């Protein structure tokens, strides 16, 4: 069967890439209100393509409310021949990032170009290419098995607002949770370690964003008349931020680590097996110095498996040319916290407010604003039946051992696992060098075909693992 799947995919690769290029011409930028019609065109294109592939049910689901409308998601369903077969839900997104700065693109971002085995266009890797390989994988499985229905019931939920923070996705999941009910969730919106080092992601960190606004005098004051005698909001803000970490790089919020689960020796060994070149990694950050962070952990462990606090921006007072001798009336900072399994964004928001309240000097008022409910982390144990099935499928497609990674970023995956109460499996073939969110986004065309192979094998592996597919993802 493996040979038949690979042969079908090779034979139909041209058709696959022609369809993908057509989809990539649609500028479905969810963050730009002027592109709302294009996001809708993108949803319609995908629904039509899935219907053409053979999915008997394809629907476009509106999101938001009448007063606060969102952008559409696409739902599709293909029942298994065996009604007792497990149900697999595939998640991805059809919206894309903005393209600025345009002058840094080597070709127009919505005019796909092939170059050296790469397909260049906005959305090629994140996430249209990785969504579409599932349709090719399904066609390959059916052809290789002479079947008219998949071995598992397949459902897809492809959202249209991921790149603008998924503001309506959790509500959509709750509204449609019965139709989206599943035994396993497959996420194809992450990356592998390298083209020649295939890997599976097993978790993503959560995040909350906050702003601290510090207020002092009613107006800017002359520093010669008042400096050193009245509270300075910038001084107060600097003191708060300087106390955010202790001498070992640990976040100083009381209770911040109470629910953090330490890495096991086995997990640390999995990370250590990755061919990580710290010097080269620092080079990609434009930093010729040394890595830093929480003491006692490697760089990989810090960015994947440890919670963090970062100062994202600071401003206040005079920032124009020349001098201006004032005590400013206000100062501001933006912060973000990356969270790991079992940390609740609401709890951390409360810890931040307590931290600030305890350290605010007299004569200063501070307002802490948290941006939305935050995003919980998502994590699937390496030895879980669903992840094991994904590993076997990838190893069949790539013909080599699969390593395990995590990702330091955040997405709506935790909502999927928590609301639908199903384990997550991350099956993706993107690479860090795909330049997602940046000019000249690209995807390795051969890896997309490997993704299609993996998808075809995954349905068999999950069907075989059906008795063990229980239990929600940790978050």
Short names for language-model regions:
Residues 29-84, 110-112, 393:
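A non-catalytic alpha/beta surface segment that caps or lines the substrate-entry region
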Residues 151-232:
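Histidine/acidic-residue-rich, glycine-tolerant segments that coordinate divalent metal ions
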Residues 2-6, 10-41:
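N-terminal capping segment at the start of a domain
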Residues 95, 244-248, 353-363:
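A common structural junction motif
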Residues 52, 83-85, 194-195, 252-330, ...:
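An extended, acidic, His-containing surface patch that forms the Zn2+-binding/catalytic region
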Residues 217-220, 224, 229-281:
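Polar, glycine-rich mid-to-C-terminal structural blocks
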Residues 84-158, 450:
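Active-site metal-coordination/substrate-binding segment of hydrolases
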Residues 125, 218, 337-345:
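A generic structural motif
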């Amino acid at each position: 069967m493996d040979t038949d799947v690979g042969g079908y995919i090779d034979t139909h690769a041209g058709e696959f890439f022609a369809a993908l290029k057509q989809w990539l011409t649609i500028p479905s930028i969810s963050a730009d209100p002027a592109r709302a019609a294009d996001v809708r065109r993108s949803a319609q294109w995908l629904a039509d393509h899935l219907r053409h592939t053979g999915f008997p049910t394809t629907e476009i689901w509106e999101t938001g409310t009448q007063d606060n409308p969102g952008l559409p998601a696409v739902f599709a369903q293909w029942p298994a021949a065996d009604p007792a077969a497990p149900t697999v839900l595939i998640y991805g997104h059809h919206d894309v990032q903005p393209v600025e700065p345009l002058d840094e693109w080597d070709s127009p971002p919505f005019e796909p170009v092939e170059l050296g085995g790469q397909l260049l266009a906005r959305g090629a890797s994140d996430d249209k290419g990785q969504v579409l390989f599932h349709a090719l994988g399904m066609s390959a499985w059916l052809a290789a098995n002479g079947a008219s229905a998949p071995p598992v019931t397949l459902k897809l939920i492809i959202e249209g607002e991921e790149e603008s923070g998924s503001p309506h996705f959790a509500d959509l999941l709750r509204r449609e949770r019965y139709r989206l009910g599943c035994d396993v969730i497959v996420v194809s919106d992450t990356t592998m370690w390298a083209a020649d080092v295939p890997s599976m992601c097993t978790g993503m960190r959560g995040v909350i964003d906050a702003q601290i606004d510090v207020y002092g005098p009613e107006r800017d004051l002359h520093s010669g008349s008042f400096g050193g005698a009245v509270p300075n909001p910038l001084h107060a803000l600097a003191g708060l931020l300087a106390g955010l970490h202790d001498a070992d790089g640990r976040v100083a919020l009381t209770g911040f680590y109470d629910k953090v689960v330490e890495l096991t020796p086995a997990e640390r060994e999995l990370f250590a097996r990755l061919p990580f070149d710290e010097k080269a990694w620092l080079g990609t950050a434009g930093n010729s110095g040394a890595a830093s962070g929480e003491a006692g952990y490697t760089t990989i462990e810090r960015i994947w498996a440890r919670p963090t606090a970062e100062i994202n921006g600071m401003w206040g007072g005079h920032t124009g040319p020349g001098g201006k001798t004032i005590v400013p009336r206000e100062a501001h900072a933006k912060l973000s916290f990356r969270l790991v399994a079992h940390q609740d964004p609401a709890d951390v928001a409360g810890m931040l407010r307590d931290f600030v309240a305890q350290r605010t000097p007299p004569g200063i008022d501070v307002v802490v604003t948290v941006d939305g409910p935050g995003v919980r982390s998502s994590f699937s144990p390496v030895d879980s039946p669903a992840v094991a099935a994904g590993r076997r499928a990838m190893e069949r497609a790539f013909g080599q051992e699969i390593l395990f990674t995590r990702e330091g970023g955040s997405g709506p995956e935790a909502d999927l696992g928590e609301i639908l109460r199903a384990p997550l499996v991350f099956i993706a073939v993107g690479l860090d060098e795909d330049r997602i969110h940046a000019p000249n986004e690209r995807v390795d065309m051969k890896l997309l075909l490997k993704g299609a192979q993996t998808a075809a094998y995954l349905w068999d592996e999950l069907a075989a693992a059906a008795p063990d597919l229980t239990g929600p993802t940790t978050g």
